[in-house]
From Swiss-Prot:
Keyword hit for tRNA-binding: no
Record PTM text: Proline residues at the third position of the tripeptide repeating unit (G-X-Y) are hydroxylated in some or all of the chains.
PANTHER family reported for this sequence: COLLAGEN ALPHA, COLLAGEN TRIPLE HELIX REPEAT
Gene name for this UniProt entry: Col3a1
Organism field: Mus musculus (Mouse)
GO cellular component: collagen trimer; collagen type III trimer; collagen-containing extracellular matrix; extracellular matrix; extracellular space
InterPro entries: Collagen, Collagen_superfamily, Fib_collagen_C, VWF_dom
The protein's name: Collagen alpha-1(III) chain
Biased composition (Low complexity): 100-109, 186-198, 310-321, 354-379, 399-412, 606-615, 678-691, 717-727, 907-934, 945-960, 1068-1084, 1120-1132
Amino acid sequence: MMSFVQSGTWFLLTLLHPTLILAQQSNVDELGCSHLGQSYESRDVWKPEPCQICVCDSGSVLCDDIICDEEPLDCPNPEIPFGECCAICPQPSTPAPVLPDGHGPQGPKGDPGPPGIPGRNGDPGLPGQPGLPGPPGSPGICESCPTGGQNYSPQFDSYDVKSGVGGMGGYPGPAGPPGPPGPPGSSGHPGSPGSPGYQGPPGEPGQAGPAGPPGPPGALGPAGPAGKDGESGRPGRPGERGLPGPPGIKGPAGMPGFPGMKGHRGFDGRNGEKGETGAPGLKGENGLPGDNGAPGPMGPRGAPGERGRPGLPGAAGARGNDGARGSDGQPGPPGPPGTAGFPGSPGAKGEVGPAGSPGSNGSPGQRGEPGPQGHAGAQGPPGPPGNNGSPGGKGEMGPAGIPGAPGLIGARGPPGPAGTNGIPGTRGPSGEPGKNGAKGEPGARGERGEAGSPGIPGPKGEDGKDGSPGEPGANGLPGAAGERGPSGFRGPAGPNGIPGEKGPPGERGGPGPAGPRGVAGEPGRDGTPGGPGIRGMPGSPGGPGNDGKPGPPGSQGESGRPGPPGPSGPRGQPGVMGFPGPKGNDGAPGKNGERGGPGGPGLPGPAGKNGETGPQGPPGPTGPAGDKGDSGPPGPQGLQGIPGTGGPPGENGKPGEPGPKGEVGAPGAPGGKGDSGAPGERGPPGTAGIPGARGGAGPPGPEGGKGPAGPPGPPGASGSPGLQGMPGERGGPGSPGPKGEKGEPGGAGADGVPGKDGPRGPAGPIGPPGPAGQPGDKGEGGSPGLPGIAGPRGGPGERGEHGPPGPAGFPGAPGQNGEPGAKGERGAPGEKGEGGPPGPAGPTGSSGPAGPPGPQGVKGERGSPGGPGTAGFPGGRGLPGPPGNNGNPGPPGPSGAPGKDGPPGPAGNSGSPGNPGIAGPKGDAGQPGEKGPPGAQGPPGSPGPLGIAGLTGARGLAGPPGMPGPRGSPGPQGIKGESGKPGASGHNGERGPPGPQGLPGQPGTAGEPGRDGNPGSDGQPGRDGSPGGKGDRGENGSPGAPGAPGHPGPPGPVGPSGKSGDRGETGPAGPSGAPGPAGARGAPGPQGPRGDKGETGERGSNGIKGHRGFPGNPGPPGSPGAAGHQGAIGSPGPAGPRGPVGPHGPPGKDGTSGHPGPIGPPGPRGNRGERGSEGSPGHPGQPGPPGPPGAPGPCCGGGAAAIAGVGGEKSGGFSPYYGDDPMDFKINTEEIMSSLKSVNGQIESLISPDGSRKNPARNCRDLKFCHPELKSGEYWVDPNQGCKMDAIKVFCNMETGETCINASPMTVPRKHWWTDSGAEKKHVWFGESMNGGFQFSYGPPDLPEDVVDVQLAFLRLLSSRASQNITYHCKNSIAYMDQASGNVKKSLKLMGSNEGEFKAEGNSKFTYTVLEDGCTKHTGEWSKTVFEYQTRKAMRLPIIDIAPYDIGGPDQEFGVDIGPVCFL
């Protein structure tokens, strides 16, 4: 590979081995160049010396060194030809062959023609399919190179070569068009082979001569070099069917193609004799197809070739004659069910079959007479949970949501097809030469330019040595079909091949003969009950409908059962020969055929017309292996193969030299989430951090201990009783007291704040069916209701008649929770009793466990009309309609489209109890549902047995001071402590009241006689006395008064889990609680029994739009589309992953700004968008003029039904239910107030979220403001305030309001991570450079990383400060201060989320602080250093990578604890 490099990447030249490296560059004028005293024109190419090549490009000289390949040549004596740079292998010469038809051998090449003028750039082609890998080129020629060979690029051929010495043989030019063939000459003597002439530059193509008469067939020449891939031609007409040839030799393995459809099996081709390989030439342009040659003699049969890859499907051949009927095959697998046939005539009566399993429920019988009023049934067992309903229809488009936060960069898509070339920009000035670049990967081969004008013929060079034989060229395009050859002898049968892949299904065969009677199957499961009515005769088939729009791609279906084998299709045309596939397993050997008697050779008769293909004869004996046949013509290029499996991973390369620090790149795409690391050992307590911000006023602390005693004062008057004594040790827990009696019920308390969601209340009893009302005004779309608990399955009732509309009730308060019923066993289905009047509703059973979504049930029969819907709020008065003609009231019209759900109606009156339904069969156990919300607190269990005392745990950190506890019972008298040192003198207290008379003291020792003085005032207290000796232990005093509660002790060690206590007895039912708010939606129950088929319901309204799904996996690459119009230049794509740092190049000159390119043509029109959301209702219009009086309505209108009828949706024309009677319903203020209260509570939770999963806060600071009473702990936050489903769980420090997010994982395991390559030490990034390393990620591991990244981005925007700690565990590794040198040169670097680096010294904004430094020397023991970084730029955190310096030795290990990142 060799490339010219220029500042603006001018062009790329592709060679086979060598690499050109930019050496020098000089400028003259715009047209010509001057170099070393010689003048050259633009686009001239010359070699000043053998290993240098130069080109003149519009006044600029580009010279490059030719670097020879370092790989040794595979020949004993490589040679460097004169005037060349690199060594090549000498080629043996071969004598010219004497051809059998008397023609002389091919003469030497003619003199090279003059070079052509440079062609203009061709239009960019469409991107081609990847070609087959080409054969390796022959080594080039090079002088003064150590080993390896090279030739410079053939694309230099368009430049004028000026050199003092004639060049060696170049590559052959493109083939000219065939000239007119001359008359055949007389056979000459075979001439001796001439020496090859100098290879000239390619000549200018001559004009195409008229086609001459076909010459005699020439002998098969040696295989020419592989031609250049031409553009795909149009498919030719299928040629006549050729004779089966012997198998060809195995070709080189091509690039695996996409698997084609299996074609019809082609005929074997003949083996060609491998010709001598000529020197590899350039790929020539496709020549015109030659005339058909005469058919050659058929070669002997070759050895069977390896199985080829499946070829393209050939065109279907003409249908062959019907073969003789074969013996009956094995019965095929059962086919798919056919369409229903017409009813057959009744068969003969069969024998009595075995008793079948019980059938499914029959269709409902005639409606029975109403039975007598039944008693209320006992509470039924809870029915099994029902299936999830089938998904609702698509809802109408909701209003457009708030634009979401920008998503993260998606996974990189597969490369699109190459776009068309953009308009070239203006040429910039040449840059200064850069340093040598590293050897690049081979570039794609450029398109062939047009032939240049002929150059001046060069002097004839010396004879070159023959090159080594090249690899076989790629297959050429198939030649035109030759004339049909005579029929060959039938070859012996080959061994059976391995079974082929399953072919495409054949055409549908005629009905086969009836198979034998199958074994009786097991009784099937109960079918779903059929709809009523007898089956009608099948209607005549309808015409085909219009093609529907293509639906969305379905999910991958399960593999279908194999269909019955179809009859053999007609024999297709032979397909093109596929590439040889991998060798298959040996098939079973075929049976030897009978040996035929030898026939005498007959005279060749005239060729008869092609007879029809006869039936296949018996296989003949295996013949001897034939000689290798001539090479067949190269076949067409096959389809690209399936991509091969990845090779084994290579060994790790040597570490590169450290490059200079590159500029900070754009943030890379987030790395994949690493596995959770093993939890690290618990570190010792860290040192005290820097003082935090001043907190708010804390809660009142516990009562302080009593201070030390002051020095003895002067004797006072008798004091009052002394202060309370010091608290004694805390007494042990008392035994539990007897259970107190039940207290009187207290008065109702004031309304509390809304509680957490309680369990779902039972559904109210179903009211009696009301008459169907007119459609009400279309209400605002309510939120989807909660699914009701599946009741037991009732028998299908008769369809009731439409009753008159009942009045609408208001929403009832949710009922109390019913006690869960015991689960009954499944009873045998009883006969259907006569319908009694409905009994009272039994209590609702507890909801079943959540099941997986059941399959969609069969549609049930049309149900009887439901009860009246709840009345919507009265709509605005509509405009008066136009006057209608007086008509008789028509029959009731069909039901209108269902209106949107109104607000929940009140509970109806209790209906009379229905008969308890038969318990349905138990459904399959569902998958465990999602974890539900915490249940209500159960009754306390009886105390479990005392557990064994656990081992003492490590002492925990002291918790915050608790609230003062209740006063403890008096402890026993403590042992008298030693006397304390006298305290400093206290202030004189106020004089106390006189105390009771004390006991007389013992007489003191006599003092020294003082001088008589005047009575003085009280003196200052004396100095501290010396401490007295320890007194004897006094007797136990009487118990003191209860002491003040002591400070809370440190938390005791956690005891082991106690054994599970016995289940407590069920407590008495508590008083009914106040109705709780509606519970959260229960998880779907397991699948219920399949319902009866209902009549087709009317089309429902569209459901609400679902949440946006997570991005799916990338689909398979589509087929390339047609080239689009040239689009405008796109915006720069996202930065790729950070590459290795390249060598530091010299700065180039500043280029001038180019002219702005033209604006591209407008893109194609986009697809039609989805239907927009329904607009908000417009402002009410002005009232219209009053209409004329309507016709008199029918009797008995008005009431709630009249209101419901007003403004009915799309009511056509006059409605008899319009009226102006006053509204006749009572407003239940209590229910309205309770509804308002519930709505108020929900709004309150939106305004002041409590940090639960249901009501996440924006961040912990908001939570602290709204709820100052909350303690520090884990809460849910949703910084982007979008859907609650992406809320994240964080730790809230309620002292400061910080929001802290843990890393995931939180530790890097302690181990040997890096081995030094011996170069000088440097910082090594853990996530970027170390094997198994990873960049740190944050947030819950079960959330997608891009969701956490979005939340972090919003959290940064909401914060003004951020901080984070990192603990580095070291073993023989310096983390910060090097104790030996006393400096911080070996300190770690940390990388923030914006790829900024934090260091030990430098700019104070980017330096970290060290809280504890235990990694200052190599001790062979584990220690740790704790780093902290605080910033007012929240964008810099969290820390995503760490780069130690002092690592790489065999005994150097480290690990990391990643502390949580906290935002404030």
